[in-house]
């Protein structure tokens, strides 16, 4: 039997595929903009026949119909990175958050630490050789498919066929659900003056020929805009966005000087506009790989002049970075921040950067704080932080004492909060005992 016959034998409608899920199964579900939406709704429709199905996933772009309150008891969520679709469920205790570095998620599956019976993933249609591309999200999906007993492929004719280490052979698939639905789009934001200032300062740390890790949002967009005069930049990142596409088209990103995968944009997922999804379709410039490769710090470090640009919710005056919670309330997750911070630190000429606005809540709350809020999780330790960038400047923390760090971070805090930060450091005796606020460092 050739692959086409096997593929056709496994075609079924979405309701039949949903019946392959049993009570008490652990089910991996692909996430981000690749969430297999028809299966989510089909599972919701048969919720009354299911009990305690564990759904294991990262964030979903758009709604999660299985996170509704009336789904409790039928489905329970284990979330590896929290997004808006599941944040309320996590904060209310209806879903569980699992802290993990992005590079380690595939190993959770392969090692058997989290056995998976069913994997549900979105793919592009098969190519002429019978391989299904995972399209806009490779991340942990390939590992889940490798270990699952049942693999359900939601084959979306509107999914781009991406290249790299992101293919599933048709014979590995238990069920094929053919469909056509638009991927969620996240168009680029318009950076504010604050974000533009941050972007310009970050860009000053980027040399020609550097390799970048960029995310999505106003800060990375502002960084890319500020890099217009740079030459031969490369990309090794978690995520590809519209701004990466724009920088390729403008000639800023060529990958010509990359020391690992020269000429290639290496990533594990893509998120942006339909124009981006069309751009990466069958484009050999892009190489999509699983997160245990893209986010492996030792792989990242093989890129010389690696510049990692990550954000934070708050940074304390010693350099501890909180990026997953607002106090005790989980907001997002570890993601790949520390993967890239450490990878860039090990890279020859690497530059690990934490970039954030100096304030939140319309300027009423400082994001450079004396201490992280009670319950806040530290994602990047103070021993790992090299640069903290705000619209007020660049704090260089590498090789600095706590006393010196206070000075560096005060200088990039909003002026309205510097005196309070100084007083707190003095009261905690981080600044010298002979020092009193307003005198300067003794």
Region locations from a protein language model:
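Conserved alpha/beta enzyme-core scaffold
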Residues: 1-442
